[in-house]
């Protein structure tokens, strides 16, 4: 029966949802083109080693062997292939690229998610300025505004915040690892046991509140100002504060939150990272951030980079269907092909009626509740 079923985690796409998805891809692609980004496209198959830095819990790539016995995978990520491309060509950064394509990740059984995901995004490579983050967030905000996505929440985090606090605490490697494991896993009882010996540390009041430091940006910044030394706020939080101010100026309708308790989505993130969702949504619509170690697996020289990726499937599910337009069939004799095609081109939701007789055309229109435009000469109708 396997020839009648799809592999777990895959689906066919057709009908109104497929149309919505294709229109969405076109809208996002045009936005990136108009913003001056250059198109880039990498192969669906890559060598497994390209994705060594990738760490996605509970997920594995689809894997196979090529004719030389080398392990190749269907790409589970679209950022690392761009790092591979830069390291193996004479392209000189900075570059501003946009892409659209599918990634494949074998998820846990019964997870309720799909293994094939369509993404569209941008990569700004070679830019150290905070303006690169702002450029990504600005493009995302404009696209969401164009799509009419309201009640959007954008959550900002910093991949270096936890490491900086741990350095300030001067923990040894084993203690730091145990601390991070408990903290990110939200194992609060273990976390409380780990911070108990630090009761005399000036950061102890902060450590007690840290697991709950997520939510409205103004509230979180006020708490941090009360709990942390000013140098920590200046060093690590200033970029977050500036980014929040930028977003509120550009997109006042956007709800911006801060989460200083979340683990970076990948180990190669080195600064601000973000994701967005709508009220009641269970998937991120877009995500991204800074990763200044982009080429670490490919060459000695590192490059600063910021990226943004839309989950096309998640966004598609948030968009309404286009208003129903009555289907219209256009029927004509073979000699009227050009006239019939011209009629289809100027009639909303019309298509050629590919049958041989008017009676068949009428039956097809009735079956699909469609209008029928008959171009055949009256004398040809018996």
Curated annotation (Swiss-Prot):
Swiss-Prot/TrEMBL GO biological process terms: histidyl-tRNA aminoacylation; L-histidine biosynthetic process
Lineage top rank: taxon: Bacteria
Alphabetized UniProt keyword annotations: Amino-acid biosynthesis, Cytoplasm, Histidine biosynthesis
Molecular-function GO term, any one: transferase activity
Any Pfam family hit: tRNA-synt_His
InterPro entries in the record: aa-tRNA-synth_II/BPL/LPL, HisRS-like_core, HisRS/HisZ, HisZ
Gene Ontology CC terms: cytoplasm
Pathway this chain belongs to: Amino-acid biosynthesis; L-histidine biosynthesis; L-histidine from 5-phospho-alpha-D-ribose 1-diphosphate: step 1/9
Chief site of localization: cytoplasm
SUPFAM superfamilies (alphabetical): Class II aaRS and biotin synthetases
Intracellular or extracellular location(s): Cytoplasm
Subunit structure: Heteromultimer composed of HisG and HisZ subunits.
Additional remark text: This function is generally fulfilled by the C-terminal part of HisG, which is missing in some bacteria such as this one.
Family membership: Belongs to the class-II aminoacyl-tRNA synthetase family. HisZ subfamily.
HAMAP family tied to this protein: HisZ
Biological function: Required for the first step of histidine biosynthesis. May allow the feedback regulation of ATP phosphoribosyltransferase activity by histidine.
Protein name, entry field: ATP phosphoribosyltransferase regulatory subunit
Species the sequence originates in: Lacticaseibacillus paracasei (strain ATCC 334 / BCRC 17002 / CCUG 31169 / CIP 107868 / KCTC 3260 / NRRL B-441) (Lactobacillus paracasei)
Gene: hisZ
